[in-house]
Amino acid sequence: TPPPPASPAPPPPRRTAEANDVLSLLLATHLYCVLQAVDLRAMEFEHTKAFEPMVTELLKQHFGALATAEVEDKVRKSIYKRLQQNNSYDLEQRWHDTFSVATGAVVEALAGQEVSLASLNAWKVACAEKAIALTRSVRDSFWAAPSSSSPALKYLSPRTRVLYSFVREEVGVKARRGDVYLGKQEVTIGTNVSRIYEAIKSGCIAPVLVKMMA
């Protein structure tokens, strides 16, 4: 009978420590990115809640009874489709471009109706200007809120809220807002990832994870 195959030798201790360090760094980077994505998605939800009624109101204001639910639906689809395509544009350019494209959807939806070019242009300009102002307002109020009362918290479950609050408040890693928005150099992404990494390596995050699983 042939002897059983030998068990593989365990990795050297130094390699094990290196693997743990790499894994901790990957977890820290992933957690940083996930929380930033949570904040941005929550900001989008807050914006949408105010944006859609605004579009409806301006359609009715400029086109009256012609602005039926069907017309609103076509225009809304055109807007969101264009926003997916021009997300690399600056704020003002993006909204003016979006409503220039959406004007075509209005023309198509109201084909056969008497709609003046002046009304179309007035609607386009009004929508773009109000969308720009709304975006700035939502963004400013979102970033101004302390982490303990961030609008993002209401979109999280009680368990994930614990982890969000730990990173944002106890570790002190805030959402990245950008140097242009702040008007000065912000703490680098690498520095913030390092803070989360240290919380993982030191074991500070362990009670938080236990609380999440309770």
What role is predicted for each listed range?
Residues T1-A214:
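C-terminal auxiliary extensions adjacent to catalytic cores
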